[in-house]
Amino acid sequence: MAEVKLGMKTQVPASVESQKPRSKKAPDFPIVEKQNWLIHLHYIRKDYEACKAVIKEQLQETQGLCEYAIYVQALIFRLEGNIQESLELFQTCAVLSPQCADNLKQVARSLFLLGKHKAATEVYNEAAKLNQKDWEICHNLGVCYTYLKQFNKAQDQLHSALQLNKHDLTYIMLGKIHLLQGDLDKAIEIYKKAVEFSPENTELLTTLGLLYLQLGVYQKAFEHLGNALTYDPANYKAILAAGSMMQTHGDFDVALTKYRVVACAIPESPPLWNNIGMCFFGKKKYVAAISCLKRANYLAPFDWKILYNLGLVHLTMQQYASAFHFLSAAINFQPKMGELYMLLAVALTNLEDIENARRAYVEAVRLDKCNPLVNLNYAVLLYNQGEKKSALAQYQEMEKKVNFLKDNSPLEFDSEMVEMAQKLGAALQVGEALVWTKPVKDPKTKHRTNSGSKSATLQQPLGSIQALGQAMSSAAAYRKILSGAVGAQLPKPPSLPLEPEPEPTVEASPTEASEQKKEK
């Protein structure tokens, strides 16, 4: 028994030891970033209401010191259009973490969206000091300098961005700067490099095709537009440009077939309805042409090319008062184009307002130094008024322009223009066919009026297509993959590269609007 008791005594301490309470759990100290994973999850799922609820809870727990929660809330405010509120929150993030370049980039972007481009450049320069190898900072600086019209600085920054990381949007912005400076050759070189880097980018292919189209290099234009349509058969900009090329060469039915496809994608496009209207004009369906052009004018009331075409069609239909109305409106928007004044003078002549017609011709002669039709029409008016000496002076000026054009280009003149010049030369006793030595090719379409008024132009008609501006404003979809564990600071969503604003578009070749009215 003694041994048993002794054994029990030896077991008691072990049992008591096992029943002692364990040491208390370590206290939970508040972790500022403990809800970051949940905030990030709601944000990438675009569940912004739930995201804002978690952010509010997190900021209450951390007394407003959670940088990531503030950052994401600022992003949501920006998406909702509250740019000023987002700017203030990004500035708070910059105060909490002054060495973080991402915070400064977002501050600068908000300033840019508020139109404060100079302030944005200053903040971007501060961010560049913290991270000198960020292509995004260089690109956005280039965009800001572009809006400030400091094109040299903008080019330097964009070239730096390309050295750090080649990106389609940077090429587009650099090409746009060259276009703003009027340097079409350099713009084409930039877009060629961009196409080499990204050969399947339909925006770049379409833009390059349009630039070649503007230069009249139809083979290369058709090649690049065809490539764009190969990768994206529904690319309405390329289809519109291809239709314009066909329209320029008189294939109105084929062009209308192309435009029918485009109308499904962009039914409210002013250039589309302008082109359709001029196709009907080339087919001599004038009522349909006016209907389409007036729709284009309704969609773009300040486009002078549409007004020009409306004036031209009304002249063809002998509706001279309406033609005067539209041509006057076009002159208000484009006061430096001599051909508009010539057409206005034709309308005024048929309205029997000779004094104002003479003034319009004087202005047309002053502004247009290349088109012999201006001088020919003016000479006809002067001859009809009995001023043969002044008419002879205008006729001789016309001869100089014709000789210059024949020496410098293989241009074929309108047969009715040649006939009228020969008749006027005979009437002025200067002989016939003095400058018309080349055979004349009849145009496909001629538009006459009972009053004997016909105007024509030696250049391609105006206002057929305006697709390049949209092509130059592609959006960047630049994102990073965000990952992280509970309690870890997640990477912040990057600031998107700034996108160029759509500018007034570069025109491609118009249609048979060159069949204008020349006075007889």
Curated annotation (Swiss-Prot):
InterPro entries hit by this protein: TPR-like_helical_dom_sf (IPR011990), TPR_rpt (IPR019734)
PROSITE patterns: TPR, TPR_REGION
Subcellular location: Cytoplasm, Cytoskeleton, Microtubule organizing center, Centrosome; Cell projection, Cilium membrane; Cytoplasm; Cytoplasm, Cytoskeleton, Microtubule organizing center, Centrosome, Centriolar satellite
UniProt keyword Cytoplasm, yes or no: yes
Region (Required for localization to centrosomes): 1-66, 338-520
GO cellular component, one term: motile cilium
Mapped TPR repeat ranges: 67-100, 102-134, 135-167, 168-201, 203-235, 237-269, 270-303, 304-337, 339-371, 373-408
Domain of life: Eukaryota
Tissue: Expressed in the hippocampus and dentate gyrus, the columnar epithelial cells of bronchioles, the olfactory epithelium and the inner segment and outer nuclear layer of the retina. Expressed in testis.
GO biological process: one example: positive regulation of multicellular organism growth
Principal location: cytoplasm
Family matches, as Pfam families: TPR_11, TPR_16, TPR_8
Region annotated Interaction with PCM1, chain positions: 101-337
Stretch list, region Disordered: 1-26, 488-520
Description of the deletion phenotype: Males are sterile due to a loss of sperm flagella. In mice obesity is associated with hyperleptinemia and resistance to the anorectic and weight-reducing effects of leptin. Although mice are resistant to the metabolic actions of leptin, animals remain responsive to the effects of leptin on renal sympathetic nerve activity and arterial pressure and developed hypertension. BBS mice have decreased hypothalamic expression of proopiomelanocortin (POMC). BBS genes play an important role in maintaining leptin sensitivity in POMC neurons.
GO terms assigned for molecular function: alpha-tubulin binding; beta-tubulin binding; dynactin binding; protein-macromolecule adaptor activity; RNA polymerase II-specific DNA-binding transcription factor binding
Keywords: Cell membrane, Cell projection, Cilium, Cilium biogenesis/degradation, Cytoplasm, Cytoskeleton, Flagellum, Membrane, Protein transport, Repeat, TPR repeat, Transport
Family note: Belongs to the BBS4 family.
Oligomeric and partner information: Part of BBSome complex, that contains BBS1, BBS2, BBS4, BBS5, BBS7, BBS8/TTC8, BBS9 and BBIP10. Interacts with PCM1 and DCTN1. Interacts with DC28B. Interacts with ALDOB and C2CD3. Interacts with PKD1. Interacts with CEP290. Interacts with DLEC1.
Biological function: The BBSome complex is thought to function as a coat complex required for sorting of specific membrane proteins to the primary cilia. The BBSome complex is required for ciliogenesis but is dispensable for centriolar satellite function. This ciliogenic function is mediated in part by the Rab8 GDP/GTP exchange factor, which localizes to the basal body and contacts the BBSome. Rab8(GTP) enters the primary cilium and promotes extension of the ciliary membrane.
Protein name: BBSome complex member BBS4
UniProt source species: Mus musculus (Mouse)
